[in-house]
């Protein structure tokens, strides 16, 4: 994110650019991205009003079906903010506390880890995907119970002691989903609908199995370039196989949605529709490491204390053929959401242009 931080310095100087000029910056960036082959949807909003929303590219290249603004994308790691919210709701229901030991709920061979460590990627847990890739029978589909079983059986060492440093951990978010199931006795997928998606009327959002995705006509397939430089379905590549044999995992990914639903989610976080303002503020607070330094990852969100518009929280996602990002300038209620389905390499350039455009409309 160093490029983003450097951009902020420029943005502070440029933020007073004439409004029409700022809109032109975004329009030109969109046009350039489209010429470079970008396929996806971009939404820019401020204080409850959508200022810009545009789709470009293809839902499927094979059938030459054009993308629409309401099309549904894999969110990849943007899913973690929903998993974190499920934990926050559990906390407010009195089912757990953030500083509870993980061992209160889940048996794993890694003592000393708290729920907060899992939320903030400070647990030191090993990567579950590497374990499963080495040992799992890939003719079968694994989910959280199998992942937990293999963590216990093979018990690879931790990277560091809990709280010592930050290291991004998909394993931690698998365990968080399993904690939710343990304390509620409910399925995480169905409970996510009941606690988040249905109350917010996020009708296009869900944690879908592969066959469910195939049945959704408006689902934007992920694409990668083949040896001939043509975009083809990402599922034809060996590197995508894990999305099949880990197809039942819950917590670190698998949520699919569209930009309008994500904007409903964004706006709900200002209005205490799901949890209290106090809990949201804690979610957007850096974690203090054992050495006293701060780690700027909260509960499912990266945190930037300073930006052109004050405090910012954000997250990115990356699955085969998909790149996603949500940026929220929470002091001024400004939002940028970009969902891409052909692995566009320069998403941050679009974010930078959108940020400049938000200075004045």
Residue ranges of model-derived segments:
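Bacterial Sec-dependent N-terminal signal peptides
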Residues: 1-25
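Short, conserved catalytic-motif segment at the N-terminal edge
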Residues: 23-73, 95-100, 155, 361
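Active-site SXXK
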Residues: 42, 48, 72-99, 173-181, ...
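A short acidic/small-residue loop/turn micro-motif
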Residues: 57-61, 246, 343-345
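Short, well-ordered beta-strand elements
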Residues: 86, 312-315, 325-342
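Short, glycine/proline-biased beta-turn/loop segments that scaffold the active-site neighborhood
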Residues: 98-111, 200
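Short, surface-exposed loop or secondary-structure junction motifs
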Residues: 113-316
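Short, gly/Ser/Thr-rich active-site loops of penicillin-recognizing serine hydrolases
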Residues: 342-361
